[in-house]
């Protein structure tokens, strides 16, 4: 035990980014025809766990593209290999397709389970679209 004390200064632990940083991720089955994909550009305040940024949904259907602000929080599992649990929410204006007339605010929610490099799995939902257990990849 006494031998360990002298080595404390030379031991290192892997620590994620500190302070304020930018991260970009893609959520979804990229390459699957017609699958909705969410691109996220997020500013992370590591000390507080607050996250905010822009989400962009792309889907190869009429009215399938949306760009809007999101915000949320990051939680740490603290168990074994520490994972980041990211909760995001936002709203965007959705215009109903013709022949209907009108627009309304649509809710968006996302939940991601990522490692310190921001790779993992997650899901999101908006309107009548619910996507679970898709890849999350840092870009």
Model-based region annotation:
Residues 2-11, 29-32, 39-41, 74-139:
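Beta-sheet ligand-binding and adhesion/scaffold domains
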Residues 22-28, 54-58, 88-94:
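Generic short beta-strand segments
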Residues 50-52, 71, 85-87:
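Beta-strand-dominated lipid-handling architectures at cellular/organellar boundaries
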Residues 44-65:
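N-terminal glycine/threonine-rich, aromatic-flanked beta-hairpin/loop signature
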Residues 64-77:
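Surface patches in mature domains of proteins
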Residues 18, 33-37, 46-48:
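Short, surface-exposed loop/turn motifs at beta-strand boundaries within globular domains
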Residues 34, 62-66, 102:
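A generic structural micro-feature
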Residues 11-13, 19-21:
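Charge-rich, low-complexity N-terminal segments
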């Amino acid at each position: 035990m006494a031998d360990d004390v002298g080595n404390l200064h030379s031991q290192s632990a892997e620590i994620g980014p500190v302070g304020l940083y930018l991260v970009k991720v893609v959520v979804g089955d990229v390459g699957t025809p017609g699958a909705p994909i969410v691109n996220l550009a997020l500013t992370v305040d590591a000390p507080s766990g607050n996250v905010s940024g822009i989400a962009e949904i792309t889907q190869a259907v009429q009215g399938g593209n949306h760009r809007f602000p999101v915000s949320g929080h990051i939680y740490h599992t603290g168990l074994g290999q520490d994972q980041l649990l990211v909760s995001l929410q936002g709203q965007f204006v959705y215009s109903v397709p013709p022949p209907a007339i009108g627009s309304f605010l649509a809710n968006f929610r996302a939940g991601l389970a990522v490692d310190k490099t921001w790779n993992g799995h997650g899901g999101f939902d908006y309107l009548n679209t619910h996507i679970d257990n898709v890849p999350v990849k840092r870009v």
